[in-house]
Each structure stands twice: as C-alpha cells, then as structure tokens.
Amino acid sequence: MRIGTFNILHGRSPDDGRVDVDRLATAVKSLDCDVLGLQEVDRDQPRSLGADLTAVAADAMGAPEHQFVAALSGTPGGTWMAATGDEQPGSASYGIALLSRYPVVSWRVVRLPPLRASVPLWSTYTRRPFLARDEPRVAVAAVLDGPFGQFTV
C-alpha cells in the first residue's frame, strides 16, 4: 500500500510558474499512490484554467473515490469567504482533497479557524513578501476498506 501527500500549488509548476493540467496528471500518475492527500487544490479557478484539479488527479491515479473539500469560496488572495458546512460552493473554490483507489466507508470533514494574525507570503509577481490575512483551514479524513481491513487516513 502506498500513501502520499502532494501540495499541488493549484496546478502551477515551481519550475516555470505555468499551470499545466496534463503535467499535473503526469506527476500524480508517477507517484503511483493508492491513497493521496492534496493541498492547495483549485476548482473552477481562473488561475488554474477553470479545471477541477481533484478530478484531474483522481483520473490520473485511477482513484474512483475522491472528495474535494473547499476551505474558501472565491479567489485566494482576493475576494473570498469561508466555505461552511458539508456542502461545496457552486463557484470557484480552493481547498484540499483526498483520493483513494480503495472503497470509502465514511468521510469526515473538520473545519478549522484561520490564524488571527496576518501571515507573510511571497509574491511571484512582485518578487517580494507581503502580509495577507490567513485563510480558513480544513481537514478531511476517511475510513477506507483496504486489503487488510478498514483503516483511517
């Protein structure tokens, strides 16, 4: 069993800064994970070409079970609001995802508050740091039916 985690930087390559969903799919496939946690996942965001990056990754790794969980609805670094509840926003959103080749018995979402202080971020556009208000945080867990019984990730 292979379990992994991957900060996908909303599909952007750290090498050239371009978003390329085919390159993302190739990277995910090369990991050959049975279960994969993704961070910095976009859905329907202009900066990631309007793609559903969870679906791109799930298809690439052959994961029939997957769940995207939005931390926020809107544009990170721009205008947004915290996503709440179990329902997912129908608009552009940003969050995390969990993908599995094994059947999912149950899912659990935990919403966490943002930090109260602003956090320093690096701007690839201005090439200098700036202070930004922290965004909401979220966690997702699943009970999976694996080859040796049920387990939680």
PLM-predicted stretches and their roles:
Residues 11-14, 112-131:
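Surface-exposed cleft-lining segments at the edges of enzyme active sites
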Residues 84, 94-95, 100, 109-113, ...:
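A substrate-binding/cap region within the structured catalytic cores of diverse enzymes
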Residues 89-91, 132-136:
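A short catalytic or substrate-binding loop motif that flags glycine-/basic-rich loops and adjacent residues
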Residues 1-3, 96, 100-105, 119-121, ...:
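Beta-strand-turn-beta hairpins that frame and shape the catalytic cleft
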Residues 1-94:
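N-terminal, active-site-proximal structural segment of metallo-dependent hydrolase catalytic domains
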Residues 74-79, 107-108, 115:
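Membrane-interface segments of envelope glycosyltransferases acting on lipid-linked substrates or membrane lipids
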Residues 64-67, 104-109:
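Short secondary-structure junctions
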